[in-house]
Structure formats: structure tokens, C-alpha cells
């Protein structure tokens, strides 16, 4: 995971929350598709105006209020004219300053979003934050242990609870998924035990997908040998799989 802070002239303006056009704090989800390129983007806006841009759940960019506002406007596909008007009103800067920084930000966002885009450290001149140098307003990812049951009996298992430990019902898990979204958590990983033993797993994946969350699965992969079952998970919206043996 790369943690960066956008570095351009706009960050030299006042590092304060804009006085006008105040988007509500929350988590916003966007999809980028261009030919064979596909990316999922999350922008988390904090109450103090700062933001966090997360690309494909594996690149994290910390944004000050000015950069967060501009990123929000760009991702919301506001026109150049609208963006210039809003930013000028919020920060009392010239049209030329906004236009210059908008062009820089557009280029940076385009490269960050593309799977084969420029390296954010060596090619985009982004500043690096040291790990754990800042406390995020919410986790970037939440792992949910759906069950502690397993269809293996490994001597090296790290499962901390008894296999008979009760699980929650599907509607209870959906409430938890909704709460994680409301908290600003964009990435969910279903784990266990063996999560594929829970027949409602595809339903939970689909629910998280409808929220806008990226979903992953930690599994021993035994049930994934069933192509019909695997297709069901993919159709529900599963994004990635980690096989643990």
C-alpha cells in the first residue's frame, strides 16, 4: 500500500476546509472503465475537509481540503467551468491558478486510476507519508469472520475459537455491512473458519457490492473447485480471492 499526499500548487493554498460548496462527509464510490482498463475508486471525505482517495483497495492517497474538494469535483464529472467557479469562490484564487492545478490533478488522477499508470513515487512527484504517521478516520479494510466451522482439519490452524462458535444470521451480517459503509470502510474481506460453508455468502457479497464496497475472500478453496459455485460468487461481485493452506 502506498500512502501519498498530492503535491501541487493547490496544496500551497490555505490548508483549511473550503468556506463554500461543502460536500457532505462520507464515502463515495466510482468506477473507471476505459477499454480493458477497469478500476474502482473510493473517496472518503472527513468532517474537517480532508480526504482519502483509495484506488482498487490497494493505493491510498491522503488529500488536504483543497485537493479533496478538487478530486471530488473531478470524480463527480463537474465541468471545467463549474470546477473553476466553485474553487475560486471557496479559496479566492485566480482562474489561472485553478486551471493550472486542475490540469495537474487531472493528470495525477488519471495515472493513479489506470492499472498500468505512472509510478506515484518516482514519476508523479507525490510526497510519501511514513507508515502510521497519520491516524485515519476509519479503517481501510474490515475482515468479517462469517463462521469458525471448517471442512479441513489442519494441525497448524490459527483459528482462535471453537469450531462450534455460533454465527450470525444473514440479516445481521447485512446490518454490519451497512454500518461499515456508513463508517467509511470501502473494503470487506470474508474470512473464517471457512466462509464458503455459509450458503448466504453470495448474498452478502452482492449486498456489499450494492453498497459500493470491494469484496475479497479468504478460503481454503475446496468449494471453489465447483465451477457453478465459483460462478455464483463472481456474479455476485467478488473482487479477489486469497487461498490459505
Name these PLM-found stretches:
Residues 243:
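Conserved phosphate-donor/acceptor-positioning beta-strand/loop module used by diverse small-molecule
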Residues 2-14, 59-143:
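Long, charge-rich, low-complexity alpha-helical segments
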Residues 1-72:
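Acidic, low-complexity/disordered tracts enriched in E/D and polar residues
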Amino acid at each position: 500500500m502506498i500512502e501519498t499526499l498530492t503535491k501541487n500548487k493547490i496544496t500551497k493554498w490555505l490548508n483549511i476546509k473550503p468556506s463554500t460548496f461543502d460536500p457532505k462527509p462520507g464515502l463515495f464510490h466510482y468506477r473507471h472503465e476505459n477499454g480493458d482498463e477497469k478500476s474502482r475508486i473510493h473517496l472518503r471525505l472527513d468532517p474537517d475537509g480532508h480526504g482519502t482517495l483509495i484506488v482498487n483497495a490497494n493505493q491510498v492517497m491522503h488529500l488536504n481540503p483543497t485537493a479533496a474538494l478538487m478530486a471530488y469535483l473531478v470524480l463527480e464529472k463537474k465541468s471545467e467551468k463549474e470546477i473553476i467557479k466553485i474553487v475560486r469562490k471557496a479559496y479566492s484564487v485566480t482562474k489561472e491558478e485553478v486551471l493550472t492545478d486542475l490540469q495537474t490533478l487531472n493528470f495525477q488522477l488519471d495515472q493513479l486510476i489506470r492499472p498500468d499508470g505512472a509510478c506515484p513515487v518516482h514519476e508523479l512527484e507525490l510526497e510519501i507519508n511514513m507508515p502510521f504517521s497519520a491516524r485515519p478516520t476509519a479503517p481501510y479494510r474490515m475482515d468479517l469472520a462469517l463462521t469458525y466451522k471448517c471442512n479441513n482439519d489442519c494441525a497448524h490452524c490459527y483459528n482462535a475459537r471453537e469450531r462450534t462458535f455460533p454465527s450470525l444470521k444473514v440479516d445481521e451480517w447485512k446490518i454490519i455491512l451497512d454500518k461499515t459503509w456508513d463508517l467509511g470502510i470501502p473494503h470487506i474481506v470474508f474470512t473464517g473458519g471457512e466462509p464458503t460453508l455459509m450458503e448466504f455468502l453470495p448474498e452478502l457479497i452482492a449486498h456489499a457490492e450494492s453498497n459500493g464496497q470491494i469484496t475479497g475472500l479468504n478460503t481454503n478453496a475446496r468449494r471453489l473447485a465447483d465451477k457453478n459455485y465459483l460462478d455464483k460468487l463472481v456474479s455476485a461481485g467478488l473482487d479477489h480471492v486469497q487461498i490459505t493452506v
